[in-house]
Amino acid sequence: MKRKYILKKESEITAVFRSKKRCGNSSFIIYYSKQNVNTYFKFALSVGKKYGKAHERNLIKRRLRAIIRNYSSNLNPAFFFVIVIKPPAKNLTFQQLKTTFAKFASKINLLLSNN
């Protein structure tokens, strides 16, 4: 993923959480906010230590980055979003993660066109 698509500044991430807009289930929560000035979307991933060991946390982050990369051409450029991953996501396959992300993304109008 290119650096321009990643939320790095704490102030940007805090602003997304303060917007209090969210959508999720027991596996993960997507916090999002709409920005007026962006030409591309930005995102961040958060996995707590309760999720598991480092290699498990890295695996789920790699999977979600791959899913976001797959949908990147269809994601609304006006959005910043943070995905908080919870321990039940361990039991999901890549395909289940992909369908769950697509469902929530279309629900919050993050996708420009449904795939």
Swiss-Prot record:
Underlying gene: rnpA
Lineage: Bacteria, Bacillati, Mycoplasmatota, Mollicutes, Acholeplasmatales
Protein name in UniProt: Ribonuclease P protein component
GO biological process, one term: tRNA 5'-leader removal
Family statement: Belongs to the RnpA family.
RNA-binding in keyword set: yes
PANTHER family: RIBONUCLEASE P PROTEIN COMPONENT
Species for this entry: Phytoplasma australiense
An annotated GO cellular component: ribonuclease P complex
One protein family per Pfam: Ribonuclease_P
EC number of this enzyme: 3.1.26.5
